[in-house]
């Protein structure tokens, strides 16, 4: 079986894991990195890339992100929103999906989604919200990625074709999440792996899985 880890900060040691590693496979400006100067993460760590001039750099990656809005940490929401919208524009320009970090700013994120009308997929990573919040994201076309600490009701309500699984910053086998989610959803682990592989290719614009 092949496990997909849709968002992680650690390179896995397991041979049967395809991991989308933040800063290695994705390019973006996290809201926590906006003070004093925004610095997108790329291969080799943080790079002093000016905002809005990352087209050539970003086009080599699977996705833009993680980026987004955080009402509890980082600079003012005005600054966060301005930089986030630049990355939305970059996502559309280089035809890459968006990986989103959002804390206590869901209503504004949903409003921006409706206003921007993006053609590229957006993923809300590390979702722990309640079913009502899940529905609000699904209604405007989001993919939702679950990690440890998920809301069980939301996990069971999320359509399989819009779901992703991740370890985020936790050092733990992604297989542990798959096993737990399969039990909660009444699926075989193999079936869940197949569904996540399909979602990987859909979200990342038919990017072939590594062999």
Predicted segment positions?
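Mid-domain alpha/beta scaffold segments of enzyme catalytic cores
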Residues: 1-211
